[in-house]
């Protein structure tokens, strides 16, 4: 079954929830970037978090970029999500594997380190808006929760999970974002918090066949209402035409060097690792148009 998310609301219409099964898109990212376990967990969680944020905050042609700028061994992680629920991303150091924690789980916090989480929203205004918060946990879900509270003033709870198999394949990936709407009472918040704390590890649930609808019922109750079900996917908007335009911004001397010394050029998209080859003649055309 393809990856998808569901949007749900509780019976009182005071709690909004988005849940997602993202195994395929995280698997796609893992294969494209050849990530090892710790890098897979960090990139995967950031992709899921960015996807959930886009589903919660964006509309029409909006897009957002999440920058997880930790000082840990994986380096920076950047993901860009669109309102149509497509997402792309990359991690600075894809080949990081760390000793597991005592509970056997990947030490995501150690892989990430501290510093900053930034979210830039481009909503068609004159300037994109960037919110920045310190990395408070490094486990990523808590950091998204902190961002929503501080930068968006939205009381929320975020859960993110990626299960990496011993052979580096992705066994499961998914998550949720719960938002308290203005009418939510302290009692409701306490009850839903209790339900979330009682959940087994999210990876365990997804490995056992939990669907986004099932997860919504576990968190909001079986009387919750599913408002929407939408496909999600890893997708990059790079193209040879875009890279041709980038080449056209180079100095003529640089293009001439590529033509005369290298007899061509190969550009690689950092988000999806797609390769674009330009022949000598194609570079000459770029140079001609640039002049």
Swiss-Prot record:
UniProt keywords (A-Z) are: Chaperone, Cytoplasm, Disulfide bond, Redox-active center, Zinc
Q: Where is this gene product found?
A: Cytoplasm
Segments crossing the lipid bilayer = none
> A GO biological process this protein is involved in?
protein refolding
Q: For this UniProt entry, which residues form the secretion signal?
A: none
Molecular function GO labels: protein folding chaperone; unfolded protein binding
Q: Under the cellular component aspect of Gene Ontology, which terms does the record hold?
A: cytoplasm
How is the protein modified post-translationally, according to the record?
Under oxidizing conditions two disulfide bonds are formed involving the reactive cysteines. Under reducing conditions zinc is bound to the reactive cysteines and the protein is inactive.
Report the InterPro entries cross-referenced here.
Heat_shock_Hsp33 (IPR000397), Heat_shock_Hsp33_C (IPR016154), Heat_shock_Hsp33_N (IPR016153)
* Pfam families hit by this protein: HSP33
Q: Is Cytoplasm among this UniProt entry's keywords?
A: yes
Q: What family does the entry list?
A: Belongs to the HSP33 family.
Q: Report the protein's function.
A: Redox regulated molecular chaperone. Protects both thermally unfolding and oxidatively damaged proteins from irreversible aggregation. Plays an important role in the bacterial defense system toward oxidative stress.
Please identify the protein, giving its name as recorded.
33 kDa chaperonin
């Amino acid at each position: 079954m393809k990856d998808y998310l569901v949007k749900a609301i509780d019976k009182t219409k005071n709690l909004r929830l988005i849940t997602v099964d993202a195994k395929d898109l995280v698997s796609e990212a893992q294969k494209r970037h050849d990530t090892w376990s710790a890098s897979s967990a960090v990139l995967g969680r950031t992709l899921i978090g960015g996807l959930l944020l886009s589903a919660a905050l964006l509309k029409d042609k909006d897009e957002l970029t999440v920058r997880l700028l930790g000082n840990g061994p994986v380096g920076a992680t950047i993901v860009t999500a669109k309102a149509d629920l497509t997402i792309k991303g990359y991690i600075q150091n894809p080949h990081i594997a760390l000793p597991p924690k005592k509970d056997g789980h990947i030490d995501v916090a150690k892989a990430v380190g501290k510093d900053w989480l930034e979210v830039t929203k481009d909503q068609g205004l004159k300037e994109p808006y960037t919110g920045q918060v310190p990395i408070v946990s490094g486990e990523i879900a808590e950091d998204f929760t902190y961002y929503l509270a501080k930068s968006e003033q939205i009381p929320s709870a975020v859960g993110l999970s990626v299960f990496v198999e011993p052979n580096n394949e992705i066994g499961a990936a998914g998550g949720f974002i719960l938002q308290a709407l203005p009418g939510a009472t302290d009692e409701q918040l306490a009850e839903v918090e209790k339900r979330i704390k009682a959940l087994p590890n999210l990876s365990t649930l997804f490995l056992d066949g939990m669907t986004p609808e099932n997860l919504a019922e576990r968190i909001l109750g079986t009387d919750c209402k599913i408002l929407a079900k939408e496909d999600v996917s890893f997708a990059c908007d790079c193209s040879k035409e875009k890279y041709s335009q980038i080449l056209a911004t180079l100095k003529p001397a640089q293009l001439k060097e590529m033509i005369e010394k290298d007899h061509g050029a190969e550009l690689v998209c950092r988000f999806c690792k797609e390769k674009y080859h330009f022949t000598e003649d194609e570079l000459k055309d770029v140079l001609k148009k640039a002049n």
